[in-house]
């Protein structure tokens, strides 16, 4: 006799898991709506800071923060942004894979998110610092704390290059890992948005030194917010796919159950009829 009770249990398990993934999809959607409101403002702010600082560095060649475009780093600190939670598709693995592709022997990791901590610890890669207090409520205050740490490391020559690896948000279904160099700052060419009308006093070099923390903070805050949006979008997509797959599997198992149940009933009827005929 077919194992109908086993199939029934399996159908029930799949149905319950689908309910859980659907609930997680709804939670991720709500978080995505909440944090998406910050993205446009953050993009505009970071863009303006980038443009302004490019204008500043175009007018100085002596700052400790500047290097030529052919600069080669011996030791790099990689600031890696992951999530604290799983079930978000390839969000973490794509970022970590990009880091591993570029990592040198002497490099170290500044891990943001518990998944980054556990991943690079498992790879026996040195973690210089770690931050796990990160979610959709990430604030500028927290970003400033990270920015201060990075600035101190660079000024004290612990690293000759600092890069951040995050997930760039393109739209609700498209996001990709990306790298931004924080230090040293490489001059960008052909940016005349502000430079033709701005005059820096006392001079661009002093202004750069006194406001460099604004530059770092804009990058840290912007990339973490963008990564948070990407995380929630990735989790929503992953849970939506899991829910749909669960429903499809439930339908397949239900069809199999009904066929086996129908076969079992038909067999029982045949046995009853056969027994009645034998008695007659």
Curated annotation (Swiss-Prot):
GO molecular function per UniProt: ATP binding; proton-transporting ATP synthase activity, rotational mechanism
The entry's keywords: ATP synthesis, Cell membrane, CF(1), Hydrogen ion transport, Ion transport, Membrane, Transport
Record-level GO BP terms: proton motive force-driven plasma membrane ATP synthesis
CDD domains: F1-ATPase_gamma (cd12151)
Membrane topology: Peripheral membrane protein
Cellular compartment(s): Cell membrane
Major location category of this protein: membrane
A GO term from the CC aspect: proton-transporting ATP synthase complex
Family matches, as HAMAP family: ATP_synth_gamma_bact
Recorded family membership: Belongs to the ATPase gamma chain family.
Entries under NCBIfam families matching the protein: ATPsyn_F1gamma
Role summary: Produces ATP from ADP in the presence of a proton gradient across the membrane. The gamma chain is believed to be important in regulating ATPase activity and the flow of protons through the CF(0) complex.
Record's subunit section: F-type ATPases have 2 components, CF(1) - the catalytic core - and CF(0) - the membrane proton channel. CF(1) has five subunits: alpha(3), beta(3), gamma(1), delta(1), epsilon(1). CF(0) has three main subunits: a, b and c.
The name this protein goes by in its record: ATP synthase gamma chain
Organism field: Mycoplasma capricolum subsp. capricolum (strain California kid / ATCC 27343 / NCTC 10154)
């Amino acid at each position: 006799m077919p194992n109908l009770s086993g199939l029934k249990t399996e159908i029930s398990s799949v149905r319950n898991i689908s309910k859980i993934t659907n609930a997680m999809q709804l939670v991720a959607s709500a978080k995505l709506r909440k944090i998406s409101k910050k993205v446009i403002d953050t993009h505009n702010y970071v863009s303006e800071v980038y443009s302004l600082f490019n204008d500043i560095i175009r007018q100085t060649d002596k700052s400790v923060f500047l290097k030529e475009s052919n600069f080669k780093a011996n030791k790099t600190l990689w600031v890696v942004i992951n999530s604290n939670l799983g079930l978000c598709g390839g969000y973490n693995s794509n970022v970590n894979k990009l880091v591993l592709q570029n990592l040198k022997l002497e490099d170290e990791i500044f891990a943001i998110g518990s998944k980054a901590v556990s991943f690079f610890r498992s790879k026996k890669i040195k973690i210089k610092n770690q931050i796990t207090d990160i979610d959709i409520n990430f604030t500028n205050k927290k970003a400033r704390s990270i920015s201060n740490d990075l600035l101190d490391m660079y000024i004290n020559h612990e690293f000759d290059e600092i890069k951040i690896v995050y997930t760039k948000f393109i739209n609700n279904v498209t996001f990709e890992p990306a790298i931004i160099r924080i230090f040293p700052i490489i001059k960008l060419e052909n940016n005349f948005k502000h430079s033709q009308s701005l005059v820096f006093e006392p001079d661009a070099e002093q202004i750069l030194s006194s406001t460099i923390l604004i530059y770092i903070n804009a990058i840290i805050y912007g990339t973490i917010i963008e990564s948070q949006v990407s995380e929630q979008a990735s989790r929503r997509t992953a849970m939506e796919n899991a829910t749909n797959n669960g429903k499809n599997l439930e339908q397949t198992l239900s069809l199999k159950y009904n066929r086996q149940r129908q076969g079992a009933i038909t067999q029982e009827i045949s046995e009853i009829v056969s027994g009645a005929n034998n008695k007659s």
